[in-house]
């Protein structure tokens, strides 16, 4: 607080030494000695007007029209859309100024997730089959193809250009059905792999390569092509489709599918026979 200061913006009083007896306004009557004290007012600088950072579209009486135009020009310069990295800072400033934050939610759908979500059971089954097919490498000539049908596995041998040779029942009506395995004859057919699948999954399965040495590829293909369109005897136990393709690749007609069934059947028969024997065996008489 300045001595003699009456208010926050009133002019202060300044002292000046003048010779005694000198008349003038501000001479103190009680002054004594050679010099007296003269008080006079010095104009206090006016308070600077607070400049608003926010430009107003309305022109003020004390502000020239060109100032309003320049303010509007400044507003236009600062209105361009900010980059994404500066949006957070601008939003924080708006919150400090009491403005409502602008919320911009950008939802980016994931195309891959949408494609992975099937809408029906048929699409689920189709996706599984496609995944199983894509997981296998492309077959080479002479490879054995295992096809997983309902209740059993069908076998074919790959030749060329997505085509295979396989055993099929004489009637096309029976093709791909479980009744075809009970026929006593079959036709060697040259077909496209997709036509043989009948919507079933498949894989390359040369599982006997560790047991038998495969024949040369050119010999396998020659033997296979020589069998096309021939009618052969078919037997579920001794001459099925697996016997056929193994004979073409290794020269050994063998079916692990049948062997597994026979082994399991023997085990079941043994268990039944053991139970029968135990049931008819006389029990010791206890006192």
UniProtKB/Swiss-Prot annotation:
Task: Report keywords, A-Z.
Answer: Acyltransferase, Cytoplasm, Hydrolase, Lipid metabolism, Transferase
Give one Pfam hit by family name. LRAT
Could you tell me which InterPro entries the record lists for this protein? H-rev107_PLA/AT (IPR051496), LRAT_dom (IPR007053)
* Positions annotated as active site in the UniProt record: 154, 166, 241 (acyl-thioester intermediate)
Q: Which reaction does it catalyse?
A: a 1,2-diacyl-sn-glycero-3-phosphocholine + H2O = a 1-acyl-sn-glycero-3-phosphocholine + a fatty acid + H(+); a 1,2-diacyl-sn-glycero-3-phosphocholine + H2O = a 2-acyl-sn-glycero-3-phosphocholine + a fatty acid + H(+); 1-hexadecanoyl-2-(5Z,8Z,11Z,14Z-eicosatetraenoyl)-sn-glycero-3-phosphocholine + 1,2-di-(9Z-octadecenoyl)-sn-glycero-3-phosphoethanolamine = N-(5Z,8Z,11Z,14Z-eicosatetraenoyl)-1,2-di-(9Z-octadecenoyl)-sn-glycero-3-phosphoethanolamine + 1-hexadecanoyl-sn-glycero-3-phosphocholine + H(+); 1,2-di-(9Z-octadecenoyl)-sn-glycero-3-phosphoethanolamine + 1,2-dihexadecanoyl-sn-glycero-3-phosphocholine = N-hexadecanoyl-1,2-di-(9Z-octadecenoyl)-sn-glycero-3-phosphoethanolamine + 1-hexadecanoyl-sn-glycero-3-phosphocholine + H(+)
pH and activity: Optimum pH is 9.0.
The ranges of region (Disordered) come to: 48-72, 86-138
Per the annotation, which location comes first and is thus the protein's main one? cytoplasm
Q: Which GO-annotated molecular functions does the record name?
A: N-acyltransferase activity; phospholipase A1 activity; phospholipase A2 activity
Spell out the family assignment given in the record's similarity comment. Belongs to the H-rev107 family.
Q: Which PANTHER family match?
A: HRAS-LIKE SUPPRESSOR - RELATED, PHOSPHOLIPASE A AND ACYLTRANSFERASE 5
Q: What is this protein called?
A: Phospholipase A and acyltransferase 5
Quick one: which gene encodes this?
A: Plaat5
């Amino acid at each position: 607080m300045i001595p003699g200061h009456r208010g926050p913006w009133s002019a202060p009083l300044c002292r000046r030494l003048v010779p005694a007896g000198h008349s003038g306004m501000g001479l103190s009557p009680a002054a004594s000695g050679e010099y007296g004290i003269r008080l006079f007012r010095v104009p206090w600088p006016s308070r600077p007007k607070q400049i608003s950072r926010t430009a107003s579209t309305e022109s003020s009486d004390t502000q020239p029209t060109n100032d309003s135009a320049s303010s509007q020009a400044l507003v236009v310069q600062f209105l361009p859309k900010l980059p994404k990295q500066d949006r957070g800072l601008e939003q924080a400033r708006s919150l400090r100024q009491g403005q409502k934050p602008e919320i911009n939610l950008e939802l980016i759908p994931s195309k891959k997730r949408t494609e992975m979500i099937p809408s029906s059971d048929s699409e689920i089954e189709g996706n599984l089959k496609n995944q199983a097919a894509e997981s296998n490498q492309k077959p080479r000539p002479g490879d054995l193809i295992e096809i997983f049908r309902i209740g059993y596995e069908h076998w074919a041998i790959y030749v060329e250009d997505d085509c295979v040779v396989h055993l099929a029942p004489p009637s096309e009506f029976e093709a791909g059905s479980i009744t075809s395995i009970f026929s006593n004859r079959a036709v060697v057919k040259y077909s496209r792999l997709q036509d043989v699948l009948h919507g079933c999954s498949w894989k390359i399965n040369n599982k006997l390569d560790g047991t038998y040495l495969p024949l040369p590829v050119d010999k396998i293909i020659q033997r296979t092509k020589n069998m096309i369109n021939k009618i052969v005897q078919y037997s579920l136990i001794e001459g099925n489709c697996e016997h056929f393709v193994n004979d073409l690749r290794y020269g050994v007609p063998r079916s692990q599918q049948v062997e597994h069934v026979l082994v399991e059947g023997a085990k079941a028969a043994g268990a039944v026979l053991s139970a029968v024997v135990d049931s008819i065996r006389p029990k010791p008489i206890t006192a």
